[in-house]
Amino acid sequence: MQVLLKRTAVSMIALIMTMPLSAQAQTAKSVPQSQMQMQLSFAPLVKQTAGAVVNVYAERMVQRQSPFAGDPFFEQFFGQRMPNRTEKQSSLGSGVIVEANGTVITNNHVVDGADDIKIALSDGREFPCDVVLKDDRVDLAVLKIKSKNQNFPVLPIGNSDAVEVGDLVLAIGNPFGVGQTVTSGIVSALARNQVKNEVGFFIQTDASINPGNSGGALTNMTGELIGLNTAIFSQGGGSNGIGFAIPANLVKVFLAAADRGDKTFDRPYIGASFEPVTSDVAEALGLDKVRGALVTKVVDGGPAAKAGLKAGEVVTAINNIPVEHPDALGYRLTTAGLGATVALTVLDNGKEHQESMTLAAAPESTPRNEKLIQGNNPFSGATVANLSPRVADELHLPADTNGVVVENLKADSPAERLGFAPKDIVVSVNGVAITSTDVLQQAVTGSPSFWRVEIERDGQRIRQFFR
């Protein structure tokens, strides 16, 4: 079971482990040659890095169902809709200061929906924070400490592409809210995609990571941030030696978007669908091992089509960096950055060739024309939009999806009570094909004796009748 690392609590403690380290940055990797080398301490590295790792406290107001819901006595007065209770929910995670002006990087799930965010430094100082940029698809958030101080301790960001399996690492965070804690381990694997994330490409480590470590630092032996601790695989919620970190090179791209003042994190639009290469496909195509991203569909006029990609081909590398799976392709394109031109190595009929692609954000070729549907109809309270590659990308839908999509719903609105959900695609209303938000708005006027609605959800058509 995957566990995102977030926990409530307080306090402070410190841990250290062993391994060789000079006070100077080491440029060469080496294997310990004696037991004496194994008895040296990580303490100099901890002193160098731990000050930039902070605790992140987030508070949010949440709606809880009344404990009297379903009680016949209280339903005499309130009916079936019992009033909800508003409660304050607190959570605790970690973060890393990456700029001296107080810029902090953490996980989106640590601060998502928070009404109030504070950070605490290892020296005990606390500061309020503002959210500069956040994105649930890559699970990253940039915070800015509200302070006149422009000289906060900083953890420099390293090159995660230089990380190798077997490298020594430190994990620094605030597990279970006990206070700043340091653990050590090695890089167990690279390019992991078992974590639910839009850009499925993670560093795996056996350094002990527990709930509360979310947003904490994974550092190399030269004191650089190489990953942001994000998730663990665990049956009981504690560490079992399988932890995952978002690579630092993705953190760099996300920080650059925040520094530019971007309000959203735009990833490159490919205009194609991909699937993993199976052993059967690898054998049929003459691949020496199971790797790459199999092209299954290409959108006419999209970047992939312009680059010459065709269904049935396999992308095996980008800028000569091997592509292990479709998630790795998405990661490499994202870290290359918008505006970059990349070289794709493509396998077609057993032969490899190169194609170039210039990266751009998904276009809004059809104006989204958002509308809040109101009135006496099943969609009352739903905000809908015309689909385009950009809207589809924002909602994690296939790029070639057309029509009208439900973006969000007002709480307790007729649309929500009837079971509609964000990402539902409205296909027809009373036999009228819904091709735009204007058509939908016109279709829900009037007072028919019943409503016949067809939607598409997760690729399945659903037909419903309402009176």
Each language-model region and where it sits:
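C-terminal recognition in membrane/secretory proteostasis and scaffolding
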Residues: Q2-R7, A23-Q33, L40-P44, S94, ...
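Bacterial N-terminal signal peptides
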Residues: V10-P20
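Glycine-biased strand-turn-strand hairpin within the trypsin-fold
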Residues: Q26-A43, Q48-N101, D112-A114, R125, ...
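Active-site loop architecture of trypsin-fold serine endopeptidases
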Residues: K29, Q35, F42, Q63-S66, ...
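Gly/Ser-rich catalytic serine loop of serine hydrolases
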Residues: E87-S94, L155-G158, Q204-T219, V298-A304, ...
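Conserved catalytic-core segment of clan PA serine endopeptidases
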Residues: V98-E99, K118-K148, G158-D161, N174, ...
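Cytochrome P450 catalytic-core helices
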Residues: G102, T106, G223
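Short glycine/Trp-rich loop-beta-loop segment that forms part of the substrate-binding cleft
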Residues: T103, R125, G158-G179, A258
